[in-house]
A protein has these predicted regions:
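Short, hydrophobic/aliphatic alpha-helical segments
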Residues: 7, 139-142, 224
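Single conserved hydrophobic/aromatic residue that forms the stacking wall/gate
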Residues: 216-231
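A generic "cationic amphipathic patch" detector
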Residues: 43, 67, 84, 156, ...
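Conserved protein kinase catalytic core
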Residues: 45, 151, 226
Length: 231
């Protein structure tokens, strides 16, 4: 039996008249359609009308559409809105940058930025290995892709690969406390990708090659870039 998945979760806002027992109608229809109800909330309640948000997991997008259509077909219900919970989670992306140090006073600013930061720059210029100790480099990974082999979806290109790279970066942070950032390149040329990684390498302690079809990048990076990498 095919299982429902939170990856296809939807929230449907439905309204109906209380005397017609809309909650019973909603649960009956969704159960009949083979979905899994995970939440049911009363959003509005009046004497002559009740608005209910029902959240359920579907099998796939087609199944979600079928559930919505079945609710819409009921003579005692009116579907107001359908929200795809996965799309909602991705609104605005899944990552953000936050400062590790407070910038509350002039003293804070003077040490974190100018003029104090100049001494840090000079120290690294004198001994480049200090970059790992005094910057984000030692705990930062670039998640690099050209979008040529995105999950099981094929060659979707760099923009469409970005949600996957955001997710990989979130996993780095959650499970290893490593700061990772997506780098989606608008090229599928091996030399251009390797050269780009070379150019951005000063910022990162590691490179994660993700969802890239060609296997040439690994050996090329080994020979050209002094940096940790993973595929």
């Amino acid at each position: 039996m095919v299982q429902t998945s939170p990856g296809y979760g939807i929230t449907i806002r439905v309204e109906g008249r209380p005397e017609f027992q809309p909650v019973a109608e909603i649960t009956s229809i969704i159960s009949r359609e083979g979905a899994t109800i995970t939440a049911l909330d009363v959003a509005e309640s009046q004497l002559d009308n009740v608005v209910i948000d029902v959240t359920c997991d579907a099998i796939d997008s087609t199944h979600a559409d079928r559930i919505t259509a079945a609710l819409s077909a009921s003579p005692i219900l009116k579907v107001r809105k359908v929200s795809d919970r996965t799309f909602l989670l991705h609104l605005g992306g899944k990552l953000e940058v936050q400062s590790k140090v407070p910038l509350k006073t002039r003293d804070d600013l003077s040490r974190a930025y100018t003029p104090g930061v100049a001494r840090i720059c000079q120290a690294i210029a004198k001994d480049p290995s200090d970059a790992r100790r005094l910057t984000i480099k030692r705990n930062t990974v670039a998640v690099v892709t050209d979008g040529s082999a995105v999950l099981g979806l094929g060659n979707l290109g760099p923009a469409a690969a970005l949600p996957v790279m955001e997710g990989k970066a979130a996993l780095f942070k959650r499970f290893a406390d490593v700061d990772a950032w997506p780098v989606c390149l608008d090229t599928q040329n091996v030399d251009e990708i390797v050269r780009t990684v070379q150019l951005i390498a000063p910022v990162y302690g590691g490179i994660n090659l993700e969802d890239i079809r060609s296997e040439e990048h690994t050996s090329e990076l080994q020979s050209r870039v002094d940096i940790s990498y993973a595929v």
